[in-house]
Amino acid sequence: SNYVEAVLPDGNRLAISREKELTKKELDRALYRKLKEITGRSLAWGVLTGVRPTKIAMKKLEEGMDKGAFVQWFQKENLASEEKTILAWEIANREKELLDRLDYENGYSLYVGIPFCPSVCSYCSFSSGALFDWKDSVEAYLDALCKELAYIGKVSVEKKLNTIYIGGGTPTTLTAGQLKRLLDCIDTYFSREHLLEYTVEAGRPDSITPEKLQVIAEHGISRISINPQTMQQKTLDLIGRKHTVSQICDAYHTARSLGFDNINMDLIAGLPGETLADMEDTLSQIKELEPDSLTVHSLAIKRAAKMGRSDEKPSVGPDTKEMVDEARRVAKEMGLLPYYLYRQKNI
């Protein structure tokens, strides 16, 4: 037999596979059940942590498994709730529709990072610095970046460029002239013949100006992201985002007036001091703006973030799950359907 019987500390017996991965999964389930019994708590994703559930669903989808079989298998394998199991399946199907448009054999995506921000948010762990501290290095960085883009364009000339994403940091910390220089450089070295999406993460509204948006529009960029994270002024002040709620709305309306018809907005659930009522108010304001897509993160404190190094490191608030559920409900009201699920960690 490929199984041996093990006796757990509480006296229960468990059949354990001789295969290492199966053994780990069986022990995960046994531990989860015991902790659930002791604490009275159950987790929506069961034993899963630190993974993208849709990656598992995608694998089964590509193997030809149907929805009914997947739901039964996933719940038994991971002790996940039926709601989350179905969510993973539905998102995997939407992901597949999008990914099937890409050329996996000869296609590629280009990410361009701008590691500067107006100020560093207290929760942020990305490799970026405040523009005030690095303003004398921006031109040198762009010089090096354009050289690298020229090289990548040359070595990738036989491949099909599917997507471009300019992120950071905050790309709009560049001046309008610097932004034009960067976008001109990309236009010089890369063909758009096979391009499906071109995104600039416009980011924080305190760095977005009509002139910069005009430069982005003139380069035919199809998608931008304007990221409030919250529409609560008290929270914006607390986390080091030196802008106002009205600046968020102004940046959004300016982008619409210039013809941008694919605008994403980012929110974070569980920011310090925020309640479910705060999240409901934020979502109400976002709903009025009507962005074309919405990205919702739950607060994750990394060691590299200021907040992570603080003596008063905040924990995930009790309302965070309800905040995420409310965001999902409002997004559905807005006609938005989930097409991507981030790695699930504190679940």
What role is predicted for each listed range?
Residues 37-38, 76, 218, 257, ...:
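Residues at alpha-helix termini
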Residues 35-42, 62-110:
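N-terminal [4Fe-4S]-dependent radical SAM core
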Residues 4-6, 112, 226:
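Short beta-strand motif preference
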Residues 10-20, 65-68, 154-159, 194, ...:
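Short, glycine- and charge-enriched coil/turn segments that flank and shape catalytic ligand pockets
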